Structure formats: structure tokens, C-alpha cells
Regions:
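Positively charged n-region of N-terminal signal peptides that target proteins for export
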Residues: 1-4
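C-terminus-biased signal that marks the final domain/tail of proteins
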Residues: 20-35, 43, 49, 155-159, ...
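Structural recognition of the beta-strand scaffold that forms the well-ordered cores
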Residues: 35-37, 100-103, 164-166, 174, ...
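Compact, glycine/acidic-enriched structural inserts
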Residues: 54-67, 110-150, 335-345
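Aromatic- and glycine-enriched pocket-lining scaffold segments that form the walls
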Residues: 140, 144-177
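Acidic, His- and aromatic-enriched active-site or binding-groove loops in soluble protein domains
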Residues: 181-193
Length: 355
């Protein structure tokens, strides 16, 4: 009975994730502080997002398609993460070493190894890969070695994700699993969205080689002078829809033209400011025939300071930025815990009193 309840819950969870849109960016400050930020959306349901604290020494067993019987691992590093749907599914987080890992929906293009019940002992559910990475490793190179010892399996055949992994040095890789084979790509453009594959997105950027920041110069056409109608005409043709290819191009150009700021905190705020342009409003993204509601919009935005081990987030219900500083947590003593990002779904409003 417990197994049926669990698998039913997981089926509902995956249903809620069937149209997740995510946009990610990374920026480095002049003092070397490295920030990774992202949005998350889900058109099919509320994500019941929580922030999760994992202490050192916590034992975790992965889900498989047949239950909670996959690979078991013990946390070597304390973790602060943000989960979707279930607290076990951390989709973005950072550990004490400053290693960050997150997942982005990747439908139709990725494919895991087929599930083999006889290999449960080394099977790792796809939505728990970030948790496994964050609790086990301190560097990207360690992840690349460690992944050889597990089989990443999908908990639902219709859902596939790819991963963004970063370290305080500013190095970032994208991990995509195709035909059961892990592929790591060095991410020097510093952005990520969803499908198609990462290499396809890089190739697609070549279609926009004509774009540049600022305004285009006046041009003569015979006896007529053509001039820009407004500012930013150099970006005329930059795609503005919410599809993953368009978001990838747009965030890549916004990152490339963003001024480098002095230190971590201004850069964190800059990430939030840039990602405001990728807030999906209620009504444009939802399942066919369903009334638009808050789940169809951007549900939360996060920024992680890998250098100083700080997690920042704001939500669709509360745009006030909140912060968790890993330096204030004793990961030897703290208990495993999770808390709703929005215990109260209400936006605080500061009243200005006029005298």
C-alpha cells in the first residue's frame, strides 16, 4: 500500500513538471565573486517549492521507478537547496564547498539508461542527481569521475532533464544524458534554458551575428535617410517569445552586454534584474483547455553566490529577496529540514506615510 501511495504521489509530481521552463544566467564580479541565477516555471501545476537543509552525515536513498530502493549515499557536504514538488527533488542548490548544481527540463532530446531492477543498488533517479552531486562532491572534476559509478534512470518515461553544475572558480558545465551516455559541455556562454541540446543552442546563436547593443546608425536609401525609430535598434530581431531557443538567445545577449560590477551583492541584484525580463506572466503558458493561473507563470527566481556560499530567492507571491547564508549553519548539528518558500502567499507592501 505504501509503495502504491508513493508511486501515485510521484506520478502527480511528474505531471506537475511536464512543461517546466527555466532560464539560467551566470555573472562574475570584478572582485571574482561568481553568481549563478535562474528562473523556474511549470505550466501544469504548482511546484510546492521548499528550501531544504541537508546536514553532513545524512543518509539518502534514491527513488527508482519501483520505489525508494536506489543507490544509498551519505552526505559528505552540507547543502542548501530549493526543491520542486517534493523535498527530495532539489532542482537548484549549493554546498559548503561552493559547488552548485541544478536541473532544467529537457524533453524529447535526452534519454537515460533503461531501468534494470537488478541494478537498483547503483540506480540514481534523475530528479535526485543535484542532491547526489551536492552532497558528494566539491568540484566538477569529482562529479565527472563519480558519475561513472551510478546509473541515472528516469522516474517517469515522459520527463527528462539536463543539468547545470558550477564551481566558485567560475567554471560551469552542462550535463546532458543521451542514449544513456553522460555528455559534459564546458559552458563558456554562461547561460542555459531547455531543449534542444546545448550544442544546438550554441550553433543557433550564429543566426544572430548581426545583433549588437545600442542603436544602429542612420542609413541613406537614395534620397531618403533611414533612422532608428527608438533606442536599442541594434537588437532589432532579438527573439522575444518564451520558447527555449528564443530565451537562450536573449539571455545570452543580455549576459554578454551586462556591465561587470564591483562585487557580489550588486552582481546578485543585477542577475535578478536581468531575469525580470524572463518572468513569464500568467496566461501565456498553460495546458490546452485549462484556465491560466499562477502555475502558468514564473514561480520563483534564485541567485546563488558560489564564492560566499549564499542562496537568494524571491517568488511570484513575494518579490522580497530572501537570503540563506551557509556560513551561519552548523552542518554537523543542524537537522535535515525543509520549509515552504511561501508559508504565506502574500506580497509585503511598505506603506509610505506622508506628514
Amino acid at each position: 500500500m505504501k509503495k502504491k501511495i508513493l508511486m501515485g504521489t510521484m506520478a502527480i509530481c511528474y505531471g506537475a513538471m511536464q512543461a517546466v521552463a527555466c532560464t539560467g544566467i551566470s555573472l562574475t564580479a570584478k572582485d571574482g565573486s561568481y553568481i549563478q541565477a535562474r528562473t523556474i516555471e511549470a505550466a501544469a501545476g504548482a511546484l510546492k517549492s521548499e528550501y531544504v537543509i541537508i546536514p553532513r552525515g545524512e543518509e539518502i536513498t534514491s527513488f527508482t521507478p519501483s520505489g525508494v530502493n536506489g543507490v544509498t549515499f551519505t552526505a559528505r557536504h552540507g547543502v542548501v537547496g530549493m526543491s520542486v514538488v517534493m523535498k527530495e527533488f532539489i532542482c537548484e542548490g549549493v554546498n559548503e564547498a561552493g559547488l552548485s548544481a541544478g536541473l532544467f527540463f529537457f524533453p524529447h532530446y535526452g534519454s537515460y539508461q533503461s531501468y534494470d531492477k537488478s541494478m537498483n543498488g547503483i540506480s540514481l533517479g534523475d530528479l535526485q542527481v543535484p542532491t547526489w552531486i551536492l552532497t558528494q562532491f566539491a568540484t566538477i572534476d569529482e562529479v565527472k569521475e563519480g558519475i561513472k559509478n551510478v546509473r541515472i534512470v528516469g522516474l517517469d518515461a515522459s520527463s527528462v532533464v539536463h543539468y547545470r553544475i558550477g564551481e566558485p572558480s567560475g567554471r560551469q558545465v552542462v550535463l546532458e544524458i543521451v542514449d544513456g551516455v553522460p555528455h559534459f559541455y564546458e559552458n563558456t556562454v554562461g547561460v542555459l534554458t531547455n531543449a534542444p541540446g546545448f550544442e544546438w543552442h550554441l550553433t543557433n546563436l550564429n543566426n544572430y551575428v548581426n545583433l549588437f547593443p545600442g542603436s544602429a546608425p542612420n542609413q541613406r536609401m537614395g534620397d531618403t535617410t533611414l533612422m532608428p525609430i527608438g533606442g536599442n535598434s541594434g537588437f532589432l530581431g532579438l527573439p522575444g517569445d518564451a520558447t527555449p531557443p528564443s530565451r537562450f538567445v536573449r539571455i545570452a545577449f543580455y549576459r554578454a552586454t551586462a556591465p561587470q560590477l564591483a562585487s557580489a551583492m550588486p552582481t546578485v541584484l543585477q542577475c535578478f534584474h536581468i531575469l525580470n525580463n524572463f518572468d513569464i506572466p500568467i496566461g501565456i503558458e498553460h495546458s490546452l483547455g485549462e484556465a491560466p493561473d499562477i502555475p502558468s507563470a514564473t514561480q520563483w527566481t534564485s541567485a546563488i553566490d558560489l564564492t560566499h556560499r549564499k542562496v537568494y530567492f524571491k517568488t511570484s507571491y513575494n518579490n522580497s529577496i530572501r537570503c540563506i547564508d551557509l556560513a551561519t549553519i552548523d552542518f554537523e548539528k543542524v537537522k535535515y529540514q525543509s520549509h515552504l518558500m511561501d508559508p504565506v502567499k502574500e506580497q509585503p507592501i511598505e506603506q509610505i506615510m506622508i506628514k
